Amino acid sequence: MNTKQLKWFFLIVLALIWGSSFILIKKGLVGLNPFQLGSLRMIFAAGFLLIIGFKSLPLIPFHQWKYIALTAMFGTFIPAYLFAIAQTQIDSSVSSILNSLTPLNTLILGALIFKLDFKRSQISGVIIGLIGSALLILNGAMHHPEQNYSYAILVLIASLCYATNVNLIKRHLSDLSPLSISTGNFTVMLLPALIILYFSGFFEVIEIPKVQHSVIFIMILGTVGTGIANILFFKLIQMSSPVFATSVTYLIPVVAFFWGLLDNEMLTPVQFIGAFIILIGVYLSSKK
């Protein structure tokens, strides 16, 4: 494959992997609390990456470890817990749709912090995307009173974290291999994740069958949805642009919504409209 074909291949594979992550989180929360889930996700990913990528760690120059730590925090550590907490209160399909604001947030942060230029159509995209988000959240809160849609703000914060991560990688880590970045990230996160897991009460409930069942889902999420996916994503950022790489979030809701339907989740007609408006906003904000 040439570079153009390869970047689209990576984009589709990532959409399939990450679109399935939201239902894995939902299944994991059956037997785990959010802090146990987030910690196990990172521990499984770290174990997998250290096995295949340990030899790549010495290739990271000392002065770049601060950016490895920052991308670890914004790209995985904080979002891993935010998504898990949010999905205790809102559907996985709603969470995935709000996550599609990542390219829009990438553009905003790129302009405000990393001094990238805005265009008029992109400003329109930002406004339209925010309108769609408000519609999705407010209508969901009205029609699903059993869900606490104030937790949707956690998904929006996670989206901002992802956007920060993408800009940092493109600006400061483009010369490193994706395997080095991924392995470095999870090496940094391993000890904090183990500490949080220890104090989460996980080892008191590990023998309960539903907990063990949930751990299997999170093992898949950690190794495939986090470990392998991160390597592909970092490679995609390096071979394309931050906005193209984060446009994977156009496709993620389609996959996540399919899984949600199989698990008896349903959006209202107005929420469908809100989701469509968000995607229009993201599309406009991504246009060059």
Question: Where does each model-flagged region fall?
Answer:
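Hydrophobic/aromatic residues within transmembrane alpha-helices
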Residues: 28, 37, 41, 86, ...
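Hydrophobic transmembrane alpha-helices of multi-pass small-molecule transport proteins
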Residues: 49, 69, 118-140, 193, ...
